[in-house]
């Protein structure tokens, strides 16, 4: 059974989001930013045999499923068809299983969490971002952003997440221009997620991405929280391991 999140059961949703901190904090932060009655962002609790088993967050045609154990998939499949969902983000095992039912294409890499110590250096050249500058950096940095990112909805979402205290966006300038960016994109009570660390091509292979990531780690630790992230590719996970991130499972994305 799928139950709509409202003021009476919102704490149950928060509890389910604790099962995994990257997608969980994303869903919880979206709920804080948009509330329970938004036209585009929808939030549900999946229950089975009277027990809450998963937190669901639908953003347009992207469904995030946060769970801690095995769950049934009938309600998720029905929801996917009802809302014409094109992407499901969750643990790898669920995405792999849904792939056998719904078809499509899957991607996967690691959930990662910071296990290192405090970061000592200061970062005087990293500042709160101008979103137009950040958008330009992202567009230059990777084909994914050129294909999927549209400025107005992207900026509007970040402004809402920032307004409720969930997100912080930063940029790095060198030679009088913005050349890198990174974000704290979502938070829960104990963790904050790093995302969209990017550097324009001519400044790559100089340790700048690592430099930005260390700044974000320091910011999150100063909040009394643990940094976490998802590595986009297994090769990228190797870079994060060099700065004391450890993997704790695999995320999956199913594109239908």
Write out the residue ranges for each language-model feature.
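Short amphipathic alpha-helix that is part of the acyltransferase structural core
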Residues: 1-27, 110, 116-151, 173
